Amino acid sequence: MSEPQKSEPQKSEPQNGRGALFAGGLAAILASACCLGPLVLIALGFSGAWIGNLTVLEPYRPIFIGAALVALFFAWRRIYRPAQACKPGEVCAIPQVRATYKLIFWIVAALVLVSLGFPYVMPFFY
């Protein structure tokens, strides 16, 4: 008789917050796309009446802001969790990796805050 084959538990990729950081940055860019997009195009030399149509994302801005803040919260929670929550062989247990993720988190958080606040200071540029 043959023994039934035991399936090994599948190892999942270690969760380290990269996805949440990316989602937060993308949502912040989308939240400010209605206001930042025309200014960037004008600064690059593009012009025309069609630039006024780029405000189509304005009604969705609160949703994108909420998504950016939620993603940043989950990234912060994942990155700043205690080292004891990491198993010894995982990437998050390595101090250099943890320091790099913290640095990247604060850079992304600053960029998110700048892009979220940009629509409020944009009138000073026109």
From Swiss-Prot:
Q: Does the keyword Transmembrane helix apply?
A: yes
Q: How does it sit in the membrane?
A: Multi-pass membrane protein
Binding positions (Hg(2+)): C34, C35, C86, C92
Q: What InterPro entries does this protein map onto?
A: Transprt_MerT
- Protein location: Cell inner membrane
What domain of life?
Answer: Bacteria
Q: Which GO terms describe its molecular function?
A: mercury ion transmembrane transporter activity; metal ion binding
Q: Does the keyword Metal-binding apply?
A: yes
Q: Which UniProt keywords apply?
A: Cell inner membrane, Cell membrane, Membrane, Mercuric resistance, Mercury, Metal-binding, Plasmid, Transmembrane, Transmembrane helix, Transport
GO cellular component terms, alphabetically, are: plasma membrane
User: Transmembrane ranges?
Assistant: 26-46, 54-74, 104-124
The similarity annotation says: Belongs to the MerT family.
Q: Which function does this protein serve?
A: Involved in mercury resistance. Probably transfers a mercuric ion from the periplasmic Hg(2+)-binding protein MerP to the cytoplasmic mercuric reductase MerA.
> What protein is this chain from?
Mercuric transport protein MerT
Native source species: Enterobacter agglomerans
